[in-house]
Amino acid sequence: CVQVDLMGQVASESIGAKQISGVGGQVDFVRGASASKGGVSIMAMPSTVKGKISKIVPLLDEGAAVTTSRNDVDYIVTEYGVAALKGQTLRQRARNLIEIAHPDFRDALKEEYEKRFHQKY
């Protein structure tokens, strides 16, 4: 995963408009996992790029391709925990993702949450 936005959309093939890879079957694996008996889709990633850039962002970079839609992701995992997304409201998805973001970026993500949802975090 290159980026995951606060709604759970996953960009894995581009950084903004710059293509860096192909889909590589990610969507097939995610949907296959969800469709299997007792299966769930799990996206695992480090919370940052080299400790400097958060992979959990308010919005995907302009021009980024959505590789996996928010409707196909059950869980996002970082070294800070697991964010359950399936069946959650948009507000709860955002809260769950902020909780597994790198601590250095959580305050900024909380500010974006408040702007988007017009309520205190």
Q: Across the structure, where does each feature detected by a protein language model lie?
A:
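Conserved phosphate- and dinucleotide-binding cores of soluble alpha/beta proteins
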Residues: C1-Y121
